[in-house]
């Protein structure tokens, strides 16, 4: 096992990894920007190094600065958290060059799954169902022709896209050319890659993802699934496990899990990963993408499978085999997570200083955050203040527990979105368990 790990991230995920390392007797190295000098991850780490100014390009996305700190500190591995370097293949290759273990899959796997068009083809070759569509589009004229062939509505997607960026929905064939130009431009601007492909828009649909863990010895396991259909602007708000849309459909659940494991084996996956599917009410499911990293919502899976995914990431990266079998991974109880974001009721970012913080407690209530009274919420980074996670024997019990926990949560000094979460938890469609990805559009104008 590694004796020292550098965490190439900030905020709650950096704190999460530091705590896991502490439990395992591993020393930790934090990196931080000038805006995060007093941040919690800096306070908790055994060592901390400033790597630049407040903007991401000056600090957290500065490959050379992070790698220099890792080598100088004597760290043996780098944990990327999520975002930042977690899915950057060139950074993994740099880690290899400097003799640093990267806590995640190989650069080759990240490359193959990061190209969404290539990932579709890989999934199809592995026997995993994919959404009807086409390969890379060459021109606006071809986009129009393919939209007519596939049938609207369709989605035009940047192959390097993610997080809802580089996507355009096309309702009419005559709008396909303009949408292609826009998606291509956004893909080029945000990801440095303007290549786009087209998929049929599946609606109504559920967003269901299967958690995968794989070791270097070739063992691949699925650890339940999560439903992530409560979204706004393609950003997840609430996640739960098991997926209520699969209740009574254990045959479909089993096929979905097998498809996820088959794909992970096909690409030679190592570590924690997630295969995302669209699931339609007619019982069909389709591969969307593979996230080759730890997910924000991983605590939901940890609750229902009684595992620590971060610790197993570290063990796998150190070459240890997974010591269980698939049948050792039953899903018990029901877990739910609400993302608490710093935003106004009008969905605008909220920055400032946390002047008061009261965190809910009780059995099976978890608050993952880097917030404390006096913590600064700067304008440069993701707006998530923390994640509130609960677990109960039933879904109804988990909803009640989450409502209670949200009612206890107090964050002053910045605006946050717990009222939106309570609105969702009171919605009849959500309560039925048969909600879809358009749920928040029924509650709020999504403009």
Predicted regions and their residues:
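An N-terminal boundary/leader segment
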Residues: 1, 163-164
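ATP-binding N-terminal substructure of ATP-dependent carboxylate-amine bond-forming enzymes
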Residues: 1-126, 138-145, 397, 401
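ATP-dependent carboxylate activation and anion-phosphoryl transfer catalytic cores
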Residues: 7-26, 48, 71-73, 89, ...
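Conserved beta3 strand of the protein kinase N-lobe
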Residues: 133-134
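Acidic/histidine-enriched active-site and ligand-binding environments that engage anionic O-linkages
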Residues: 146-155
